[in-house]
């Protein structure tokens, strides 16, 4: 829980997940720019899904998402492509590493509000280490395949969400829809349900990789379409 966490854990996660990405990008940027290469960062499904119990990790991956999106816009001017890989629950050493850090921290103070939960987590960590369970989850072959696509595909995506189960894909779509509806309700110029559907229909070919959007006439038509929505007067009503 965030209110019980020590800042050292946050610093550890940001050092690995955020500052590490920044340092490597800075170090290799000249070579990548010279060769017109590609940059692929490893984010996570937690870069846009947040929940109780992993807030610090999620915060670090949200930062990777923002860093990657901004870097992509900047490097585009230098003919360098940037993408993010967003794995779901695949086998890795993340959980094992976290367990080892928790058990090694013998000076950790008891939680004020969630001590029972902390003891349960520590017990599970001990059981896992005693049983010799190292990596849990689906083998990460699909993640490696996504990295290869981002590096070598002729028309790569800027984000590759890689999840082993349909339910994880459903979580991401549900979260995105929830955020769209929440954002739409925050201001006095919100759209009606029908208008939102029309906007989604307009964006659909672009999201599907329709290359007709590269056509100047099509782009002009789309600019006119969104300009019409941007300049409409008054608050929409059902």
For each predicted feature, which ranges?
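Active-site loop immediately N-terminal to the catalytic Tyr-X3-Lys motif
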Residues: 2-3, 49-56
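Residue(s) in the substrate-gating loop at a strand-loop-helix junction
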Residues: 44
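Active-site-adjacent segment of SDR/Rossmann-fold oxidoreductases
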Residues: 49, 70-81
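Hydrophobic positions on the long internal alpha-helix
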Residues: 24-28, 32, 41, 67-68
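C-terminal beta-strand-loop-alpha-helix "lid" module of Rossmann-like NAD(P)-dependent dehydrogenases
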Residues: 80-132
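Substrate-binding pocket helix/loop in short-chain dehydrogenase/reductase
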Residues: 1-2, 6-11
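Active-site helix of classical SDR
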Residues: 25, 60-63
């Amino acid at each position: 829980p965030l209110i019980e966490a020590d800042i050292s854990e946050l610093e550890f996660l940001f050092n690995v997940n955020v500052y590490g990405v920044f340092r490597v990008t800075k170090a290799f940027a000249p070579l990548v720019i010279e060769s017109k290469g590609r940059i692929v960062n490893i984010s996570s499904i937690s870069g846009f899904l947040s929940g109780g119990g992993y807030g610090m990790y999620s915060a670090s991956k949200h930062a990777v998402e923002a860093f990657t999106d901004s870097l992509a816009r900047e490097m585009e001017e230098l003919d360098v492509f940037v993408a993010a890989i967003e794995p779901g629950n695949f086998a890795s050493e993340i959980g094992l590493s976290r367990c080892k850090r928790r058990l090694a921290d013998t000076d950790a103070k008891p939680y004020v509000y969630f001590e029972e939960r902390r003891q349960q987590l520590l017990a599970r960590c001990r059981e896992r280490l005693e049983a010799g369970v190292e990596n849990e989850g689906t083998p990460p072959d699909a993640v490696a395949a996504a990295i290869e696509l981002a590096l070598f595909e002729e028309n790569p995506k800027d984000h590759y969400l890689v999840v082993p189960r349909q339910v994880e894909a459903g979580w991401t779509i549900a979260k995105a829809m929830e955020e769209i509806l929440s954002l739409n309700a925050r201001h006095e110029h919100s759209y009606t349900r029908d208008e939102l559907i029309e906007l989604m229909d307009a964006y659909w070919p672009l999201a599907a990789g329709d290359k007709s959007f590269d056509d100047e006439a099509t782009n002009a038509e789309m600019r006119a379409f969104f300009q019409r929505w941007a300049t409409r007067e008054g608050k929409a009503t059902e």
